[in-house]
Amino acid sequence: MSDQFDAKAFLKTVTSQPGVYRMYDAGGTVIYVGKAKDLKKRLSSYFRSNLASRKTEALVAQIQQIDVTVTHTETEALLLEHNYIKLYQPRYNVLLRDDKSYPFIFLSGDTHPRLAMHRGAKHAKGEYFGPFPNGYAVRETLALLQKIFPIRQCENSVYRNRSRPCLQYQIGRCLGPCVEGLVSEEEYAQQVEYVRLFLSGKDDQVLTQLISRMETASQNLEFEEAARIRDQIQAVRRVTEKQFVSNTGDDLDVIGVAFDAGMACVHVLFIRQGKVLGSRSYFPKVPGSTELSEVVETFVGQFYLQGSQMRTLPGEILLDFNLSDKTLLADSLSELAGRKINVQTKPRGDRARYLKLARTNAATALTSKLSQQSTVHQRLTALASVLKLPEVKRMECFDISHTMGEQTVASCVVFDANGPLRAEYRRYNITGITPGDDYAAMHQVLRRRYGKAIDDSKIPDVILIDGGKGQLAQAKNVFAELDVSWDKNHPLLLGVAKGADRKAGLETLFFEPEGEGFSLPPDSPALHVIQHIRDESHDHAIGGHRKKRAKVKNTSSLETIEGIGPKRRQMLLKYMGGLQGLRNASVEEIAKVPGISQGLAEKIFWSLKH
């Protein structure tokens, strides 16, 4: 053993709690990482007079330093040990063995990979994660993985001979790849990749991918899928929060913030003695047009300085946002605690990772909250209540797009009880109006849309007119003039005007072209569905306008000249070196192009000049 390492003094300081230890050599390199149910007992075994293994003797002889990280449970220690092994690749974790072989978690290389415990030589094709201290730890980890990432754990002999899924599928512990049609190849491969990343200690990547998939599902109104992924995210978060332990014994609160659709989420991680004890998401009420800095500053003040809360203050608070009164807040908290409290906004190292975790959790919690509140059914029910309608089954929204009055396109998007009905979206090319006259454009599109027979099931309950009072007046005039067989009085015409700064959440709604409008709170589900359909209509109109503009741009001036087909056009451009050369050519020069007569050359010349 190294003369510089005092084992006796060290062991006096070691706890009997579970945890992970890292052994360093004289060069500061981690040479071994271990896990123990009782750290004191396990570490004492290394410094007995009669060591059973020469390899253990070789390890102990090189120890210069030992760092210990206490965990809540053995499982927590197991996960942390695995992360450290993957991080440091200690050479004695590869060479050193106890009397029995170490078990591994095995991810097979089959078409539908399976998870299993493995001991002995690694002959089978696949990936091995470990080693783990004992079989119980592997089985416990496999059970945990099965709950979060339900990939198969059955033997191949069972898997190949199944015609219907087993009980594991019925209780949600397996995706059932043994039966065709139960799970797509892509989804199963994705879950396998999550397992691979998770066992490699890349928990953040797993969370990032899951959050992205949840947001996509939510945006596509696939709420059951979004809820399933949300539950998976929460399960991963529960594990990652337990396993993340800091080297520095941090005693701090970490506050991450997310803001969207008029709603804010403040997520607080409570870290004591370097361990994440827990976390909680708060959803403060946010008035419209409130700056994010004000949300953070107000929340922090209320959270810590209200006497009734009686919160235990940490030594340090990490914030996701710069505060103008950071020094004042720190001084106030220090006075309250009777000791120095640091408020930090630009952390580095592990602290930055803590803040990233808090920020991710805030975004995840906010997305979940919005998903719960923003189902189409809930939004339409809220809208019906605001508009004093019995129900809203179908909505249509119109928008106009043009560039300086040119290539005007109107869009109509349709929502039903399940959200966007994209198969019924329509674009209308507007012609015969004064360029830039949006009122005339709205008048034309509404007459074309509603001045004909409509099936009763296609009559909208609400028609949204993007543009405010003027456009709403046009809509009212059109419906007053309609001579149709269907009930033209059934749809409620609603004007939507953007706020002064054209910011989401500041919209004004109008029932009539005259008089004052009204606004909804920025976190109102009714407002969210209005914003959603309006944004869809706007994007649809702009998309159509861009296509029309691109078509005009890509259409050669030669295409409008009678007698010039594709072959002659190609010959002219090739002979003249492009359209610009053709524009600069004389009639005589154009007439020299094969296939171009004198008369046609004159027509081309004057068409390009005028």
Swiss-Prot record:
Entry keyword annotation includes DNA repair: yes
**One GO CC annotation:** cytoplasm
**Pfam families documented for this protein:** GIY-YIG, HHH_5, UVR, UvrC_RNaseH, UvrC_RNaseH_dom
Instruction: From the UniProt annotation, give the residues forming the signal peptide.
Output: none
Q: Which GO terms describe its molecular function?
A: DNA binding; excinuclease ABC activity
Q: Which InterPro entries match?
A: GIY-YIG_endonuc, GIY-YIG_endonuc_sf, GIY-YIG_UvrC_Cho, Hlx-hairpin-Hlx_DNA-bd_motif, RuvA_2-like, UVR_dom, UVR_dom_sf, UvrABC_protein_C
Residue limits of the UVR domain? 204-239
- One GO BP: SOS response
Q: What does this protein do?
A: The UvrABC repair system catalyzes the recognition and processing of DNA lesions. UvrC both incises the 5' and 3' sides of the lesion. The N-terminal half is responsible for the 3' incision and the C-terminal half is responsible for the 5' incision.
Instruction: Specify the species.
Output: Escherichia coli O45:K1 (strain S88 / ExPEC)
**Residue ranges of domain GIY-YIG in the record:** 16-94
- Identify the coding gene: uvrC
Where in or outside the cell is it found? Cytoplasm
Quaternary structure note: Interacts with UvrB in an incision complex.
Recorded protein name is UvrABC system protein C
